């Protein structure tokens, strides 16, 4: 049981569809979150939303995917919180967004992945921006990720 004053409710949907030459995967998530900070007369309530939508196509062993995620903001004062998340897996690998900025976070990601020489490769590009640019913050940068995973003498090797 956590005592973090967060109430989060959401829905998620994923699907797959196969064509003659292309396999499709798609999905979406939506959540709403309320947070209460402080107590008594000094208590402040914040509300933020979360949205994620993706579409992926696999053809000839290569998967191309576009993913759009919004960790919303409450007027630049509070960003949608994910205190129980697997943090390094999402929003890029440089760990710049382990905590959602108060302005929120929009992550537009394009990725390609496939197999090569007995291993798996992944190339991903992230474009980050603020959900609420009311504090003069809008462009939060971009990131390029490249990964190759293979087995060497029964041990996994990731570069």
PLM segments and residue spans:
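Transmembrane beta-barrel architecture of outer membranes
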Residues: 4-12, 23-25, 46-52, 105-109, ...
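Short loop/turn motifs that connect adjacent beta-strands in outer-membrane beta-barrel proteins
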Residues: 16-24, 60-61, 117-118, 151-159
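Intrinsic-disorder/low-complexity loop/linker signature
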Residues: 20-21, 41, 136
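Extracellular/periplasmic loop regions
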Residues: 25-116, 120-123
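A C-terminal functional module that forms or caps the active site or interfaces directly
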Residues: 120-157
């Amino acid at each position: 049981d956590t005592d973090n004053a967060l109430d989060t409710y959401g829905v998620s949907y994923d699907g797959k569809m196969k064509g003659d030459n292309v396999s499709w995967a798609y999905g979406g998530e939506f959540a709403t979150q309320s947070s209460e900070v402080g107590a008594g007369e000094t208590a402040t309530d914040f509300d933020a939303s979360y949205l994620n939508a993706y579409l992926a196509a696999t053809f000839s062993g290569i998967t191309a995917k576009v993913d759009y995620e919004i960790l919303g903001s409450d007027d630049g004062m509070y960003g949608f919180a994910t205190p129980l998340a697997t943090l390094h897996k999402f929003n890029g690998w440089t760990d710049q967004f382990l905590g959602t900025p108060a302005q929120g976070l929009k992550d537009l990601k394009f990725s390609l992945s496939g197999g090569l020489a007995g291993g798996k490769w992944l190339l991903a590009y992230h474009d980050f921006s603020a959900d609420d640019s009311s504090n003069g913050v809008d462009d939060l940068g971009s990131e390029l990720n490249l990964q190759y995973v293979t087995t060497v003498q029964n041990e996994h090797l990731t570069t």
